[in-house]
Curated annotation (Swiss-Prot):
The keyword Glycoprotein does not apply. One of its GO terms (cellular component) is prefoldin complex. Belongs to the prefoldin subunit alpha family. Residues 579-589 have a biased composition (Acidic residues). Residues 152-168 have a biased composition (Polar residues). The gene is BUD27. This is Bud site selection protein 27. One of its GO terms (biological process) is RNA polymerase III assembly.
Length: 796
C-alpha cells in the first residue's frame, strides 16, 4: 500500500511540474504576441528605429524591419507580421488545451491518493469486519463413521472455537455500535457526493477481502488424502494379511448373477454435494439455526440407513454366490503369511462396443450446413459404419484376386488360345463386300460384255469382205488405247472445224468410233489411204502425242504439251455425222463412269479387242483425214492461250479437258433434293468403311496462338502550337508543357504516397489478421479495387 501511494505522489508531482512549465510558456507567448502587435503599429506610424537591435524569443526573432520564425536546427525563415501572429495564436491554443488536460489528470491523482490514505486509516473498518464475520457460517469440524460399504453410521459436528451465544454477542455489540453510527451519520452529512462514492468503493473492496480470508481450521490435525489411503492399507493388512496375486481367484459367475443397485450410491453422492454447497454458502444465518439444520440432516440420514438395512436383509435371504470363493481356515492362515498377488482368469468374455466415431464426426460441425448435404453424408456414413464383416476388403488386403480375374500363370495360355480362335474364325468368315461395290462391278461387266459383242459383230462382217486390209493394220496394237480416249476430237469437229485444234483429250470418244459399223466400213473402203498410213509410221512415232499409252499420259492444266504436226488425210464427212450423233446419245445414257474407268482395264481390253478394230484406230491416229480437199487437223490444246481467255477456259472445263487428275469414281453428286435419298442409301451401305476412314484420318486441329503482349494503340501526333515556332524559346520550358509535366509528376507521387501509407498503417495489418467467412465457413473474397475504394472512403 505504501509503495502504491508513493508512486501516485510522484506521478502527481510530475503532472504539476509540467502544468507549471506550460503556464510559464503561455505567459511568454502572450508577451511575444503583444510585442508583434506593437511592432505592426510602429511600422504603420513610420518609426524605423523600433526596439533597438532586435529581440530573440526562442522560435521568433523580431528585428527592426523583419520577423523570422525557426524551422529547427537553427534555421530561420522570414515571415510576415500576420503569419507570425497566427503562429503565436496556434501555440497559445495548444498550450491552453494541454493545461486543461493536465488539470484533469492532477485532480484524478489527488482523488486516488485520498482513497489510499483513507484505506490506510481504516481501523474502524476492521472492527466492522470482525463484527460482520459473525454473520457468516462459523468454521466447524465434521466427523462421520462409515461402514465397509461406505454408508454413514454416525456423525458429529463440533466447532473449532467456542462461539458465544447470539444474545450475549448482540448485547455486547449494541453499546459499541450506537455511538459509532451516530458519528458516521454526522460525517456523512458533511461529506460531498464524491466522498460518498469513495465509501461505496471501499465497501466493495471489503466484501472481496472477507471472501478471500483464510479459514480458521486447525490444519495440523486434518487428514490428507494420502494419509487416509495409507491408513486404509494398514487396516487391510491387519485384517487379511499380505496376499499374493497368484492366490487371488475371482468368481465371475457370482459377479454376473449378483444384482447391484448403483442408483442409490449416485443419489447419496448428489446429496453429499448438495450438503457441501449448503455448508460453504449457507443461507441460514446464526449458529443455532445452523445446528438445528444439521440435526435434521442427521435424522434423515438415520431413517435412510434403516431403510437400506431392511432392504439388505431382504436381499441376503436370496441365495447368491459370493464374489470371492470361500476357503478353509488353513488356506486363510497361509494366505495371511504370503504376499499379495494379482492373477488373471484363464478365459474372458469380450463385449463389443458400438463404434460411434463417424457419428461424432458428423455431429461436430462448427458451421451450419444445408440439410440436403447432411442427408447425403448420413446415408453414406450409415453404410460405412455397419458392423458386418467385409470379406471383399479382407481379400484385397491379403492380395487375393477376384473370381473373374485369371492368374498370371495361365494368362499367356489364354491369350494364345484366343489368338488361334480368332484366326480360325477369320478364315471361316466370308469376306463382306458392300452392295454398292457389287452393283458397280456388275455394271462394269454388263457394259463390257455388250461393248465386246457389238464390236465383234461389226468387225467380223467387215473382215470377211476386206481381208487384205486387216493385214496392213495389225502391226500397231497400242494405238487403240489412245484412239479410245479422244471423244471430243470428233464431236467438236461437227460443230466448228477450227475449234478442233483446241481440244485433245476426251476418253469416251473413240469407244463410240469403234462401236459404229459405218465408221469402220468407210475406213476400210479406202485402201490407198491406209497404205499411206503404213508408209508414214516413223514420222508419226517421233512427233505425235498419241504414241504414248494411256497410263503414261500427263495432261495438267495450264501446261503446254508436246506439239505434233497435223497430218492430211482424206476423210468422209459421214463419219463426223455418225460420231456426233452417237456422242450425245452416249452422254444421255450415262456411260461416263464406265469410260472414265477404262484407264485401269486398258491393257486387258486391248488383248481382247479384234485386230481389225485396233488397226483401224491406229490408222486414224497416225494419218490425217481430209473432208473433201480440206485436211482435218488433230487437235492440240494451247494451255497458255486458254489461261488468257476465261470464256475458253470455261468451255474447256465443261468439255472435260481438266478431268485427267480426277479420281475414277467421284461418288454421289448432290445436285437436287432428290439426290439425298441415294446419298443416304450409300452412307448406310458404306457405314463400316466410313468409320474406318474417320479413325485412320483424324482431323488436325490448329491451335490458336495466344499473344499476351500489349496491343499497340494508334499514335496521335499533335501539331506544335504557334508559340513553339520561336527558335529562341525551348519547347520543354513552355508553360503548357511544364504544367503537364507537373500534373503527371504530382499524380505519380500521390499514388506512391498512398500505397506507402496503406502498407505502413496499423489498420491495414489488423484488417489482414481477420479473414471474413460466410455462414458455411467459406472465405469471402473481395476484389482489390473494392477494398481500396472502401479504404479510401473510410479515411478522414
Amino acid at each position: 500500500m505504501d509503495l502504491l501511494a508513493a508512486s501516485v505522489e510522484s506521478t502527481l508531482k510530475n503532472l504539476q511540474d509540467k502544468r507549471n512549465f506550460l503556464s510559464e510558456q503561455r505567459e511568454h507567448y502572450i508577451d511575444i504576441r503583444s510585442r508583434l502587435v506593437r511592432f505592426i503599429n510602429d511600422n504603420d506610424d513610420g518609426e524605423e528605429e523600433g526596439e533597438g537591435q532586435g529581440m530573440v524569443f526562442g522560435d521568433i526573432i523580431i528585428s527592426t524591419s523583419k520577423i523570422y520564425l525557426s524551422l529547427g536546427y537553427e534555421y530561420y525563415v522570414e515571415k510576415t507580421k500576420e503569419e507570425a501572429i497566427t503562429f503565436v495564436d496556434d501555440k497559445l491554443k495548444l498550450m491552453e488545451d494541454a493545461i486543461e488536460q493536465f488539470n484533469l489528470k492532477i485532480e484524478e491523482a489527488k482523488k486516488t491518493l485520498d482513497n489510499l490514505n483513507h484505506m490506510e486509516d481504516g481501523n474502524g473498518i476492521e472492527e466492522d469486519e470482525a463484527n460482520n464475520d459473525e454473520d457468516f457460517l462459523p468454521s466447524m469440524e465434521i466427523r462421520e463413521e462409515l461402514d465397509d460399504e461406505g454408508n454413514v453410521i454416525s456423525s458429529s459436528v463440533t466447532p473449532t472455537t467456542k462461539q458465544p451465544s447470539q444474545s450475549n454477542s448482540k448485547k455486547e455489540q449494541t453499546p459499541a455500535v450506537g455511538p459509532k453510527e451516530k458519528g458516521l451519520a454526522k460525517e456523512k452529512k458533511s461529506k460531498s457526493f464524491e466522498e460518498n462514492l469513495k465509501g461505496k468503493l471501499l465497501k466493495r473492496n471489503d466484501e472481496v477481502k472477507k471472501k478471500v480470508q483464510p479459514s480458521k481450521v486447525d490444519t495440523e490435525n486434518v487428514y490428507t488424502f494420502a494419509d487416509l489411503v495409507q491408513q486404509m492399507d494398514q487396516q487391510d493388512e491387519l485384517e487379511d494379511g499380505y496376499i499374493e496375486t497368484d492366490e487371488i481367484n475371482y468368481d465371475y459367475d457370482a459377479f454376473e448373477n449378483s444384482n447391484f443397485k448403483v442408483n442409490d450410491n449416485y443419489e447419496e453422492d448428489d446429496e453429499d454435494e448438495d450438503e457441501e454447497e449448503y455448508l460453504n454458502h449457507s443461507i441460514i444465518p446464526g449458529f443455532e439455526a445452523q445446528s438445528s439444520f444439521l440435526q435434521q440432516i442427521q435424522r434423515l440420514r438415520a431413517q435412510k440407513q434403516s431403510q437400506d438395512h431392511e432392504r439388505e436383509e431382504g436381499d441376503v435371504n436370496k441365495s447368491l454366490k459370493p464374489i470371492l470363493k470361500k476357503s478353509s481356515f488353513a488356506e486363510n492362515s497361509d494366505k495371511k503369511q504370503k504376499k499379495k498377488q494379482v492373477g488373471f482368469a484363464s478365459s474372458l468374455e469380450i463385449h463389443e462396443v458400438e463404434n460411434l466415431k463417424e457419428e461424432n464426426k458428423r455431429q461436430m460441425q462448427s458451421f451450419a450446413v444445408p440439410m440436403y448435404e447432411t442427408q447425403e453424408s448420413t446415408g453414406i456414413a450409415n453404410k460405412m459404419t455397419s458392423d458386418e464383416f467385409d470379406g471383399d476388403l479382407f481379400a484385397k488386403m491379403l492380395g487375393v484376386q477376384e473370381a473373374d480375374e485369371v492368374h498370371e500363370k495361365y494368362k499367356e495360355e489364354l491369350i494364345n488360345q484366343e489368338r488361334l480362335e480368332g484366326e480360325a474364325s477369320r478364315s471361316n468368315r466370308r469376306t463382306r463386300v458392300s452392295r454398292f461395290r457389287k452393283d458397280r462391278a456388275s455394271k462394269k461387266e454388263n457394259t463390257l460384255s455388250t461393248f465386246k459383242q457389238e464390236t465383234t459383230r461389226s468387225v467380223e462382217n467387215e473382215v470377211v469382205e476386206k481381208e487384205p486390209v486387216v493385214g496392213d493394220i495389225i502391226e500397231k496394237e497400242p494405238v487403240v488405247g489412245d484412239v479410245i480416249e479422244k471423244e471430243p476430237v470428233v464431236g467438236d469437229v461437227i460443230e466448228k472445224e477450227p475449234a478442233v485444234t483446241d481440244i485433245v483429250e476426251r476418253e469416251p470418244a473413240v469407244n463410240d468410233i469403234v462401236e459404229r459399223k459405218p465408221v469402220v466400213g468407210d475406213i476400210i473402203e479406202k485402201e490407198p489411204t491406209i497404205n499411206d498410213i503404213v508408209e508414214k509410221e516413223p514420222e508419226i512415232n517421233s512427233k505425235s502425242e498419241f504414241e504414248t499409252p494411256f497410263k503414261k499420259k500427263k495432261l495438267k492444266s495450264l501446261q503446254k504439251p508436246r506439239s505434233s504436226k497435223s497430218m492430211k488425210k482424206k476423210f468422209d464427212p459421214k463419219i463426223l455425222e455418225n460420231i456426233s450423233d452417237d456422242d450425245y446419245d452416249d452422254d444421255d445414257d450415262g456411260n461416263k463412269k464406265l469410260l472414265s474407268n477404262k484407264s485401269k482395264n486398258n491393257t486387258d481390253e486391248q488383248d481382247k479387242f479384234p485386230s481389225k478394230i485396233q488397226e483401224v484406230s491406229r490408222s486414224m491416229a497416225k494419218t490425217g483425214a481430209t473432208v473433201g480437199s480440206e485436211p482435218v487437223r488433230i487437235t492440240n490444246v494451247d494451255y497458255h492461250a486458254l489461261g488468257g481467255n476465261l470464256d475458253d477456259m470455261v468451255k474447256a472445263y465443261s468439255l472435260g479437258l481438266y478431268d485427267d487428275d480426277l479420281e475414277e469414281d467421284p461418288g454421289t453428286i448432290v445436285e437436287k433434293l432428290e439426290d439425298f435419298k441415294e446419298y443416304n442409301k450409300q452412307v448406310e451401305l458404306l457405314r463400316d468403311e466410313i468409320r474406318d476412314f474417320q479413325l485412320e484420318n483424324k482431323p488436325v486441329t490448329m491451335e490458336e496462338e495466344e499473344n499476351d503482349g500489349n496491343v499497340m494503340n494508334d499514335i496521335i501526333e499533335h501539331e506544335f502550337p504557334e508559340s513553339y515556332t520561336n527558335d529562341e524559346d525551348e519547347v520543354a520550358l513552355h508553360p503548357g508543357r511544364l504544367q503537364e509535366e507537373v500534373a503527371i509528376e504530382y499524380r505519380r507521387l500521390k499514388e506512391a504516397t498512398a500505397s506507402k501509407w496503406q502498407s505502413s498503417s496499423p489498420a491495414a495489418h489488423t484488417e489482414g489478421e481477420l479473414e471474413p467467412i460466410d455462414k458455411f465457413g467459406n472465405p469471402v473474397k473481395t476484389s482489390r479495387f473494392r477494398s481500396q475504394r472502401l479504404h479510401m472512403d473510410s479515411k478522414p
